[in-house]
Each structure stands twice: as structure tokens, then as C-alpha cells.
């Protein structure tokens, strides 16, 4: 998928996310992960780290070599998505206390991923 399509889908997911209430913890985390994945892929395409026909689905599904290769330009975007992915099982599939704070953190990481992607798009 090309960068422009990733931007379009991420923005669509974020429009839906904006309709969620603070207590909609599971949906906020899930949306942050989905939109964040699109922002990450857009950034990776725009900086030339990954071609448009190769997308990251989940950081934990990457080979060690791919994770390292994609982290070389800047390790933070992959780390941010990985953190959202780590939040997901505990608060979306589990019932750990502190869900609202976890959702806030996921959304904060999403904001940072979007900023990275928009900066990468501006530099292409």
C-alpha cells in the first residue's frame, strides 16, 4: 500500500477514534494500534526503509533482522507502535486496572507516530 493510502486510512480511523469517550478504553487502544500501524508504514515508505508492497502488520511479527533494519533510521517509531501493541492484550483482552490511563498513553503514542509520518511525508 502506498503512503497516501496509509495516510487516508489512518485519518479515517482517527475520525472514528475521536467519537470515542474516555471510558471507551478498548476501542481507543485498538484504534491507536490500527492507525499507528498505518502511520508507521507511511513513514517507512516515505523514508525509503520499506517499499510500498511491504507493510509492517505487527512489530512482534517482524524478524529480528527486519526489526533492526527498520529501526536504523530512527528506533522510536517502531518502539512506539510496539508499546501500543504491548498495552493491547492487558487492557483490550484483559481487565487490568488503569485502562483509561493506558488508553491515554496509547493515544499519546499515536499522536507521536502521526507527527513522525507527517514529517517523513514533508521530507520526501
Which role does the model predict for each range below?
Residues 1-124:
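Terminal alpha-helical segments
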Amino acid at each position: 500500500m502506498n503512503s497516501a493510502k496509509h495516510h487516508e486510512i489512518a485519518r479515517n480511523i482517527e475520525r472514528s477514534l475521536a467519537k470515542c469517550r474516555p471510558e471507551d478504553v478498548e476501542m481507543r487502544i485498538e484504534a491507536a494500534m490500527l492507525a499507528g500501524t498505518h502511520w508507521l508504514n507511511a513513514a517507512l515508505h516515505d523514508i525509503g526503509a520499506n517499499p510500498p508492497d511491504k507493510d509492517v502488520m505487527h512489530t512482534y511479527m517482524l524478524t529480528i533482522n527486519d526489526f533492526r533494519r527498520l529501526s536504523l533510521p530512527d528506533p522510536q517509531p517502531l518502539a512506539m507502535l510496539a508499546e501500543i501493541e504491548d498495552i493491547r492484550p492487558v487492557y483490550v483482552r484483559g481487565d487490568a486496572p488503569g485502562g483509561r490511563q493506558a488508553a491515554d498513553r496509547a493515544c499519546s503514542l499515536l499522536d507521536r507516530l502521526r507527527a513522525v509520518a507527517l514529517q517523513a511525508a514533508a521530507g520526501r
